[in-house]
Amino acid sequence: MNNGLMALQARLQHEFSNPGLLTRALTHRSFSLDHNERLEFLGDSVLGLAVADLLYERLSTLPEGDLSRVRANLVKQDTLHHLALGLGLPEVIRLGEGEARSGGHKRPSILADALEAVIGAVYLDAGFAVAQGLVRRLFQAVEIKSDMEAIGKDPKTELQEWLQGRKMNLPLYRVVATLGAAHKQTFDVECEIVELNFLERGIGGSRRAGEQAAAAAMLQTLKAKAAQ
C-alpha cells in the first residue's frame, strides 16, 4: 500500500484488513472495470442509516418528515464533497487519463461518490458499528440545522406529499436522455403522474438534479391547473 493510502487510513482512523476494498472505493469507472459504483451504492445506504441514527439521537422532538428533510440536507453532494476534501480524496482517487485531464479529481460529484464508496468499503471490511463510527466522526464538525430553512421541502418531496394527500400513486421518474461528454453530462428526466396523464421534463447536472427539476415543473403544472 502506498503512502497516500496509508495516510488516508490514518485520517479515517481505520486500518483495512482487506486493502483492496479501499483501492476499489477510490477507483472511478473511467480508470477500471473494477470501479467503485457498487461500493458507492452500499455506502449511500450505510451513510443514510448512520445519519438517521445520529439525528434520532440529537433531535429528539423533531417529527419524521422533518427528520427526513434534515437528513437529506446533511447528506447532499455539497456536504459530502467538503468532507471528501478534508480527507484528501483528490490526492488518492484513481481516474482515467481523460477524466484526470478534465479535472475530475476536483469534481464534486466524483468526490462525493468516492466518499460514499469509502464508507461502503469500511462497512464491508469491519461491519456497521465501525462504519457508523466513521460517519459520526466525519459529521462532528458539520452543523446540524433543524430550522425551517434546513427542512424546507425540495420539489420531489413537495410533489410526493401533494399526491399522497390526494391518495394518488407516487410519480414515475425516467432518464430519457444523457447529454454531453462523459465528464460533463446533463440528464434529461421525465416525471409522470399516470392517474392524471401528466408528463413534465427537467434537466440537471446529475440524475437527482434532473428529477428535482422535473418535479418542480410538474408542481408548476399542478398549481396552474388548480388555479383554473
From Swiss-Prot:
The answer to whether the entry has keyword rRNA-binding is yes
Alphabetized InterPro entries for the sequence: dsRBD_dom, RNase_III, RNase_III_dom, RNase_III_sf
Q: Where is the protein found, in the record's own terms?
A: Cytoplasm
Q: Which residues form the DRBM domain?
A: 154-224
**Superkingdom of source:** Bacteria
> Listed GO molecular functions?
double-stranded RNA binding; metal ion binding; ribonuclease III activity; rRNA binding
Q: Which CDD domains match?
A: DSRM_RNAse_III_family (cd10845), RIBOc (cd00593)
List, from the UniProt record, the residues annotated as the active site of this protein. D44, E116
Query: What is the catalytic activity of this protein?
Result: Endonucleolytic cleavage to 5'-phosphomonoester
Signal peptide feature range:
none
Binding annotation for Mg(2+)? E40, D113, E116
List, for all copies, the residue spans of the domain called RNase III. 5-127
Q: What keywords is this UniProt entry annotated with?
A: Cytoplasm, Endonuclease, Hydrolase, Magnesium, Metal-binding, mRNA processing, Nuclease, RNA-binding, rRNA processing, rRNA-binding, tRNA processing
PANTHER family linked to this entry: RIBONUCLEASE 3, RIBONUCLEASE III
Task: Give the record's family classification.
Answer: Belongs to the ribonuclease III family.
Query: What the protein does?
Result: Digests double-stranded RNA. Involved in the processing of primary rRNA transcript to yield the immediate precursors to the large and small rRNAs (23S and 16S). Processes some mRNAs, and tRNAs when they are encoded in the rRNA operon. Processes pre-crRNA and tracrRNA of type II CRISPR loci if present in the organism.
Q: Name the chain's protein.
A: Ribonuclease 3
**Source organism of this protein record:** Albidiferax ferrireducens (strain ATCC BAA-621 / DSM 15236 / T118) (Rhodoferax ferrireducens)
Classification lineage: Bacteria, Pseudomonadati, Pseudomonadota, Betaproteobacteria, Burkholderiales
